[in-house]
Design a protein with these regions (language model features):
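Conserved functional hotspot residues or short segments at active or partner-binding sites
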Residues: 234-326
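Structural motif
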Residues: 14-16
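Cleft-lining beta-strand/loop regions that shape enzyme active-site pockets
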Residues: 1-12, 21-24, 28-216
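A sequence-level detector of short linear motifs
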Residues: 26, 61, 221, 236, ...
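Polar, glycine-rich mid-to-C-terminal structural blocks
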Residues: 181, 193, 200, 204-272
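A broadly conserved detector of short glycine/acidic/proline-rich loop/turn motifs that flank catalytic sites
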Residues: 68, 91, 176, 201, ...
């Protein structure tokens, strides 16, 4: 983990732990739970780890000071072309905005003018984090999202206009697992014609829920409102039937929606115009991309599953990372 206790002492991704405090954990019958018990301990205590690293003949021993492991939102940020940067966000947490600003500053120093924001597989997170991220792209007083319910009053959230990336070209990558807070950001970008959305229709999760504590210590979440994009599209997909709702992604696959753009049909009642360019976009749940990219069906073949099961792909990845590290 970046900036975690192990990284601070020099342990690298791909290193294999073979012993904890002189007790072997490799080549012996030991459950994952038992291994984790040996690795974990009070904050500030120390643990000795014996590591095997590819390309190094002798085992390496590191003394790690146990500490809180940071949970980061950014998986990657780098330049893919001389003027184009790439940032991947895996979740919207308390530090997302700070991490994004730091990555943006670093990329802009490298000459970034355009940005690809990858929200594929991002299941959402904190509303405030989504608003802060959308604020980086939108102008002052531009609506980011609003909530409204049958009895809940409309609540609106606007951009402050002080973002660090309000003019460069922007592409947002989404897929069928892009949900909630991610859809708030991508919906705002699309409705204001700030950038283009590329990929497949997002999940369609946009409910506002109020937690209610019960006397026995349990809790229920009561849905009181829904999220709407600036143009008035409801992010939440229909959930009249729990069976249909739970099988939605399977049905998308079976109907060809994940492979062919022309298999997706919307009634005229779901057509909405964007705020500036008056382009036609669609409601009905989820964010429909401007440019469709079919799903990579290679992931579902027996051949691919066999490679994954035998560890071939992870071994190749580790070898590639090591070679790149030596070259740099």
């Amino acid at each position: 983990v970046s900036n975690g206790p192990s990284e601070k002492v020099g342990i690298l991704a791909g290193d294999r732990i073979i012993a904890v405090n002189d007790s072997a954990i490799a080549g012996v019958k030991m459950s994952t739970e038992d291994i984790m018990k040996r690795l974990r301990g009070p904050k500030g205590s120390k643990v000795n780890l014996t590591i095997v690293r590819r390309g190094v003949q002798e085992p390496l021993i590191f003394t790690v000071k146990r500490d809180k492991i940071p949970i980061l939102s950014l998986d990657a940020s780098y330049m893919i072309q001389p003027k184009t940067g790439y940032i991947r966000i895996n979740r919207f947490g308390a530090t997302t905005a700070e991490e994004f600003k730091k990555a943006m500053t670093a990329l802009q120093k490298q000459g970034m003018k355009d940005l690809i924001l990858d929200l594929q597989g991002n299941g959402g997170g904190y509303l405030n984090a989504a608003i802060d991220l959308a604020n980086e792209f939108l102008g002052q007083k531009e609506l980011i999202v609003y909530t409204e319910g049958r009895t809940a009053q409309r609540s609106e959230f606007f951009a402050k206009g002080n973002g660090d990336f309000r003019t460069g070209r922007l592409i947002v990558l989404v897929d069928e697992y892009t949900a909630s807070a991610s859809e708030i950001v991508s919906g705002a970008v699309q409705d204001w014609d700030r950038g283009i959305i590329v990929g497949r229709r997002s999940f369609g999760k946009g409910l506002v829920q109020r937690p209610i504590d019960l006397p026995d210590g349990s809790m229920i979440r009561l849905t009181i409102a829904r999220y709407y994009t600036p143009a008035g599209r409801c992010i939440q997909k229909p959930y009249d039937s729990s069976t249909d709702y739970n099988k939605d992604l399977i049905e998308r696959f079976n109907h060809g929606e994940l492979m062919n753009a022309d298999s997706i049909h919307f009634p005229d009642s779901l057509k909405v115009q964007t705020k500036k360019l008056k382009r036609t976009v669609y409601g009905g749940g989820g964010i429909m991309p401007d440019y469709f990219v079919p799903i990579d069906t290679t992931l579902y073949t027996d051949y691919h599953r066999n490679l994954v099961g035998k560890g071939v792909i992870i071994k190749f990845t580790m070898k590639f990372i090591e070679e790149i590290g030596r070259a740099s």
